[in-house]
């Protein structure tokens, strides 16, 4: 399918869905099927799924951000007969489907990470480009904020998340500067944090193309929202709640997420793990899924021209056996 988007509609809702054609092809949508969008956002993917469903089909949409739910309700109004919106994190996938009386789905989509509207809304505190209160919560009813992390977490924990979640090579010195700065005054805003990070980095690093705070902000955001901790359990729950032949499509935006998605899908697609010298299988392990494509799907030139934020997006698809 050639890349084709309604630019005016995407602009109106402040979000351009990434790898949309790949997702729709990967999900192999049936008009009467049951589908789950576990990361609703501004409903760019959900809208196109809903358009392909008949009155007998159903789409369950989850998001932990109540602002996203409100915007999506308006955007999906024409399909309210087949769409159910749920304010919930995808970590509760099994519970939500159980509460709705849905034993299995024919396809599930998860578009990981922070959405464009969350980044662009300065008040949410996700962006290092705008000065705002340190928040970074995808679910604003949750307790932990970025302010809590940078002001309360000990040096070792700060160093660990900057290194593991941000893959920041200057993690030790940045963590030291954060701890030193907060001893004098609490770190309240993204602007304060950016300046602390700048002050911690050597001149050579400040001359690089990438913004000096990018990796640190990613790390803190992941910690606030427990993004990596919830990912593998969600993927396994999704596999358990797919009908045979159902598809799981996952979009990731950085190597940490993609490694987890790739590894978990490969494990779900692997059968017997007995040593090769065993005459018969004793582990009893059978594959739950098969990989639809062994390589990740990435954006083509047309999509990148329309939406540069798709550059780092990777799509992987697996099918329930």
Describe the predicted segments one by one:
Residues 1-321:
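S-adenosyl-L-methionine-dependent methyltransferase catalytic core, i.e., the SAM/SAH-binding region
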């Amino acid at each position: 399918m050639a890349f084709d988007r309604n630019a005016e509609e995407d602009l109106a809702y402040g979000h351009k869905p990434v790898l949309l054609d790949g997702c729709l092809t990967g999900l192999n949508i049936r008009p009467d099927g049951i589908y789950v969008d576990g990361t609703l956002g501004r409903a760019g993917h959900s809208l196109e799924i809903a358009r392909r469903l008949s009155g007998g089909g159903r789409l369950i949409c989850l998001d932990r951000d109540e602002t996203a739910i409100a915007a999506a309700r308006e955007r999906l109004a024409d399909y309210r007969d087949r769409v159910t919106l749920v304010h919930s994190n995808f970590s509760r996938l099994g519970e939500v489907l159980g509460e709705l009386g849905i034993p299995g789905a024919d396809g599930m989509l998860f578009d990981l990470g922070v959405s464009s509207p969350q980044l662009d809304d300065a008040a949410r505190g996700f962006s290092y480009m705008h000065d705002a209160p340190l928040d970074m919560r995808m679910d604003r009813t949750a307790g932990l904020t970025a302010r809590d992390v940078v002001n309360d977490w000990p040096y070792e924990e700060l160093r660990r998340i900057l290194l593991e979640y941000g893959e920041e090579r200057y993690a030790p010195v940045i963590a030291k500067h954060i701890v030193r700065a907060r001893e004098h005054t609490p770190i309240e805003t993204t602007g304060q944090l950016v300046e602390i990070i700048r002050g911690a980095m050597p001149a050579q690093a400040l001359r690089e193309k990438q913004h000096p705070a990018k990796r640190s902000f990613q790390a803190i955001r992941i910690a606030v929202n427990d993004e990596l901790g919830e990912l593998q359990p969600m993927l396994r729950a999704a596999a358990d709640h797919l009908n045979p032949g159902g598809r799981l499509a996952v979009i990731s935006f950085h190597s940490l997420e993609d490694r987890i998605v790739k590894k978990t899908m490969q494990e779900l697609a692997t059968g017997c793990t007995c040593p090769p010298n065993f005459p018969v299988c004793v582990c009893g392990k059978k594959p739950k899924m098969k990989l639809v494509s062994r390589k990740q799907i990435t954006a083509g030139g047309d999509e990148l021209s329309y939406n540069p934020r798709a550059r780092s997006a990777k799509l992987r698809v697996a099918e329930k056996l």
